[in-house]
């Protein structure tokens, strides 16, 4: 009888990928990155085990916001004080904190539990073209054929 393969945390080979966000639409970039973080690109994918790889996103400040999302898309957060609902547009978010914009978008596409939090820790976003993970020897991932 055949049984379904279930990955174990010790058996997982993790790779490092570098993704260039220059002129890539935010949503398309986020879906590809979230899929890699979950491990859905591997034949050993198991939903209840973190089988994903590490992803480095560079040039976050050059990500594309299509249409009128820069003015019309609004991100909300609450300060936990009365009347503390804050809002900012995607354009302001991109101008002031481009790394946080991509992190927010990708983490919203991961599971909302402790496993999703562990997956989110493998995401490294940089506003410029330089990153500090050269020691891991990351592979350059061209996402134009994945989107």
Swiss-Prot record:
Keyword Ribonucleoprotein applies: yes
Keywords linked to the UniProt accession: Ribonucleoprotein, Ribosomal protein
Pfam families cross-referenced by the UniProt entry: Ribosomal_L13
SUPFAM superfamilies in the cross-refs: Ribosomal protein L13
Keyword Ribonucleoprotein tagged: yes
Assembly with partners or alone: Part of the 50S ribosomal subunit.
Job of this protein: This protein is one of the early assembly proteins of the 50S ribosomal subunit, although it is not seen to bind rRNA by itself. It is important during the early stages of 50S assembly.
UniProt GO MF annotations: mRNA binding; structural constituent of ribosome
A GO CC term attached to the entry: cytosolic large ribosomal subunit
Name of the gene: rplM
Domain of life: Bacteria
Native organism: Lactiplantibacillus plantarum (strain ATCC BAA-793 / NCIMB 8826 / WCFS1) (Lactobacillus plantarum)
Name of the molecule in the record: Large ribosomal subunit protein uL13
NCBIfam families found in the cross-reference section: rplM_bact
Record-annotated disulphide pairs: none
UniProt record, GO biological process: negative regulation of translation; translation
Gene3D superfamilies per record: Ribosomal protein L13 (3.90.1180.10)
